[in-house]
């Protein structure tokens, strides 16, 4: 794979005009490169950033999503490249990274040949497998497989502890995760971001209707909530859509909400978008730690 050491103004102009010459396409890879130590890595995905950090690698730059701001101590010193959907390509070129990691969802949209002219590019398909698979794939690339296995072992132990704590609260009761925003209500299915951590890692029992959702989430009306018959509800309130807090405040006085089994039994658990929607190794570990703290305070 080609990797340009010098970045010139001509490249910037070529990028803007989308007139780059033909270069080999980048394919998904599990080949091992030299260790990532001292390498300058750019991550075109906040989720891949979380996986890299779980391996002890702090990327030089990252993109993110509007609902996952890169605030917090762990992101200090990392250059912000904008949103993953529309990254700041000029800043990426100026960074002169050694390697780029990108989510397959956005690789074709941004142009793999153009990314490859900047640096060796690794494509990870986050829609295939679970976060453990993604972590292992990245670990193979950066030669940190031992780190990946150690992380997963520690994570599994933490998940077992937190699961036991939660089941003391609800036993084998049915669980539901929902998001409240000014645009409406949604419930999360069995797939990422929340399905795997809740129903696979923590081994909680999903509400039967949750298992029928064949996508990441499904929009619903509040009138549907009683039919879901959840014994416990995880609630996220959108930080992006203005007025979402007011919508949730109004919902809490609604007879439909007040009549829910989980509400009457005080089994509503307020969680936050960061880290719960950060479907990465480090994001999921932080989510477990947040839930553990939440349960200890009840």
PLM feature spans:
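Sec-dependent N-terminal signal peptides of Gram-positive bacterial secreted proteins and lipoproteins
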Residues: 1-25
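Proline-aspartate-enriched helix->loop->beta-strand connector
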Residues: 96-102, 120, 225, 229-233
């Amino acid at each position: 794979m080609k990797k340009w050491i010098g970045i010139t103004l001509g490249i910037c102009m070529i990028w803007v005009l989308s007139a780059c010459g033909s270069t080999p396409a980048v394919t998904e890879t599990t080949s091992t490169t030299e260790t990532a130590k001292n390498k300058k890595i750019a991550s075109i995905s906040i989720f891949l950033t979380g996986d890299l950090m779980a391996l002890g690698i702090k990327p030089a730059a990252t993109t993110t999503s509007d609902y996952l701001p890169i605030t917090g101590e762990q992101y200090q010193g990392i250059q912000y490249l904008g949103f993953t959907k529309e990254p700041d390509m000029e800043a990426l070129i100026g960074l002169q990274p050694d390697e780029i990691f990108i989510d397959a969802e956005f690789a074709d949209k941004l142009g793999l040949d153009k990314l490859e002219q900047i640096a060796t590019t690794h494509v990870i398909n986050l829609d295939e497998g679970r976060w453990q698979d993604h972590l292992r794939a990245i670990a193979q690339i950066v030669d940190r497989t031992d780190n990946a296995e150690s992380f997963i072992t520690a994570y599994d132990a933490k998940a077992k502890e937190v699961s036991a704590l939660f089941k003391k609260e609800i036993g084998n009761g049915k669980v539901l995760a929902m998001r409240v925003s000014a645009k409406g209500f949604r419930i999360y299915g069995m797939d990422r971001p929340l399905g795997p951590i809740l129903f696979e890692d923590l081994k909680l029992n999903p509400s039967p209707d949750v298992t029928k959702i064949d996508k990441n989430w499904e929009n619903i009306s509040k009138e549907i909530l009683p039919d879901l018959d959840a014994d416990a509800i995880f609630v996220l309130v959108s930080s992006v859509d203005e007025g979402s807090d007011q919508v949730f405040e109004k919902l809490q006085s609604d007879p439909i909400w007040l009549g829910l089994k989980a509400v009457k039994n005080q089994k509503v658990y307020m969680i936050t978008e960061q880290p719960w929607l950060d479907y990465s190794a480090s994001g999921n570990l932080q989510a477990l730690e947040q839930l553990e703290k939440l349960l200890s305070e009840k």
